[in-house]
């Protein structure tokens, strides 16, 4: 039965049938170079929220009213325009983020998905994720999103402590979060992710670990741990600056992270990325595209994208940012078909730096095969094999460089930022002194 108010098209109907099939974990191996150039992920930004959380500096707005029909039409238009511009033939995943996309109507989600499926091949079993806040996603509404084509949820739970939730400016309680999580697991079994924050002001290790243990009793097969970052311009930043709140203790945050990842490993979760943990093959296809430096298109106000504009004969990957403010973005989409505000061509070294920094965030790291897709002349051995600094990191057991490629050890993954302080300059030096060779496409 399809919930009322959800218009279904051909793709949405096929997607609902595909949701009943078992998931197959095929991540970890990069696609062939040919397919990589014709595939992309799609990010859709819904910029509106009910209120601004105290820690958040994302591009979001609290409007008096939203003309959703206009927003929907602009999202559809921009998706069509950028898909044609990119020349991609297949979209592997779609992620509705924000903002609070669970405030959008399921009809808007379905309209975007149908538009994508009309432009390119969107497999019926493609991962389609929706970020949801507990207060804006009761069970019937979640079911309506499922009927619209969503097959994976990412719930912004953040904490199971009501005092911490209040500090963060969240609109839900711990009981609200657990109720939404239970309803989501019934509707999307094996496809529900939750976020848990660490390193809050005055937060202690043991109470936080108790939260994590409690969450393990209720959660599904995917969990993300995020350390609080105090962002300038947020309420939380101001309170710490004024001395109203104590500054977060970085040593305690590091201890929480180390203890937390150990707890999750013991519970059968694979830490497949610095902040992300999965069991039973429930890795995020969409985020994996980011970490593997795959192409992705960003639509909606302030969305980011990275792709080669093959549709207009382009051969160089571009970093694109859409216009931030929703009303201005809609005006530009209406006039030009898209609201791209900034477009920067990525140099070859810039792209390789991203391949290295993003790839090392994963437990797979950067394989030789994957690296060669971006740089067929200069190998990982050429870049890192003769470096004394890298040799020292290998001896310390923080890095591994072998027949598989370059990757962090379990210990190294926890200190990746410090490792990159050695690895990125080494890449830059190797690039500067590389032998002359024909420049390959990016």
Curated annotation (Swiss-Prot):
SMART domains: Elp3
Keywords (A to Z) from UniProt: 4Fe-4S, Chaperone, Heme, Iron, Iron-sulfur, Metal-binding, Mitochondrion, S-adenosyl-L-methionine, Transit peptide
Keyword Cell division: no
GO biological process, one term: porphyrin-containing compound biosynthetic process
Gene from which this protein is expressed: Rsad1
Protein name stated in the entry: Radical S-adenosyl methionine domain-containing protein 1, mitochondrial
Binding positions ([4Fe-4S] cluster): 49, 53, 56
Residues holding S-adenosyl-L-methionine 1: 43, 98, 131
Pfam family, one: HemN_C
Residues binding S-adenosyl-L-methionine 2: 99-100, 158, 170, 195
Function: May be a heme chaperone, appears to bind heme. Homologous bacterial proteins do not have oxygen-independent coproporphyrinogen-III oxidase activity. Binds 1 [4Fe-4S] cluster. The cluster is coordinated with 3 cysteines and an exchangeable S-adenosyl-L-methionine.
GO cellular component: mitochondrion
Protein location: Mitochondrion
Gene3D superfamilies reported for this sequence: Aldolase class I
């Amino acid at each position: 039965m399809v919930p009322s108010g959800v218009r279904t098209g051909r793709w949405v109907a096929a997607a609902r049938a595909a949701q009943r099939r078992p998931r197959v974990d095929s991540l970890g191996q990069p696609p062939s170079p040919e397919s990589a150039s014709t595939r992309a992920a799609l990010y859709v930004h819904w910029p509106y929220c009910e209120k601004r959380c105290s820690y958040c500096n994302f591009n979001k707005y609290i409007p008096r009213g939203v003309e959703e029909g206009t927003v929907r039409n602009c999202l559809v238009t921009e998706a069509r325009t950028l898909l044609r511009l990119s020349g991609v033939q297949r979209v592997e995943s779609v992620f509705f983020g924000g903002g609070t996309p669970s405030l959008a109507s399921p009809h808007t989600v379905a309209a975007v998905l149908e538009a994508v499926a009309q432009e390119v091949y969107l497999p019926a079993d493609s991962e389609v994720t929706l970020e949801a806040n507990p207060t804006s996603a009761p069970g019937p509404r979640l079911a309506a999103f499922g009927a619209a084509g969503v097959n994976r949820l990412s719930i912004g739970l953040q904490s199971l402590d009501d005092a911490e939730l209040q500090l963060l400016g969240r609109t839900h309680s711990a009981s609200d979060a657990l109720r939404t999580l239970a309803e989501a697991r019934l509707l999307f079994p094996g496809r529900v992710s939750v976020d848990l924050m660490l390193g809050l002001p005055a937060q202690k290790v043991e109470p936080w670990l108790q939260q994590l243990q409690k969450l393990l009793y209720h959660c599904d097969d995917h969990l993300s741990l995020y350390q609080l970052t105090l962002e300038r311009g947020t309420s939380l930043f101001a309170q710490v600056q004024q001395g109203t709140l104590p500054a977060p203790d970085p040593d305690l945050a590091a201890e929480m992270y180390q203890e937390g990842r150990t707890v999750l490993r013991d519970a059968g979760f694979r830490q497949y990325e610095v902040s992300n943990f999965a069991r039973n093959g429930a890795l995020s296809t969409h985020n994996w595209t980011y970490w593997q430096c795959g192409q992705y298109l960003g639509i909606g106000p302030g969305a980011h994208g990275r792709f080669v504009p093959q549709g207009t004969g382009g051969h160089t990957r571009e970093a694109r940012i859409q216009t931030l403010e929703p009303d201005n973005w809609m005006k530009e989409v209406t006039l030009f078909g898209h609201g791209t505000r900034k477009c920067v061509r990525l140099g070859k070294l810039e792209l390789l730096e991203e391949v290295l920094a993003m790839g090392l965030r994963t437990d797979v790291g950067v394989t030789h095969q994957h690296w060669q897709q971006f740089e067929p002349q200069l190998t990982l051995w050429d870049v890192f094999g003769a470096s004394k600094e890298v040799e020292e990191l290998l001896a310390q057991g923080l890095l591994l460089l072998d027949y598989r490629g370059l990757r962090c050890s379990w210990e190294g993954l926890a200190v990746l930022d410090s490792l990159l302080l050695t690895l990125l300059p080494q890449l830059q030096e190797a690039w500067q002194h590389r032998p002359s060779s024909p420049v390959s496409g990016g």
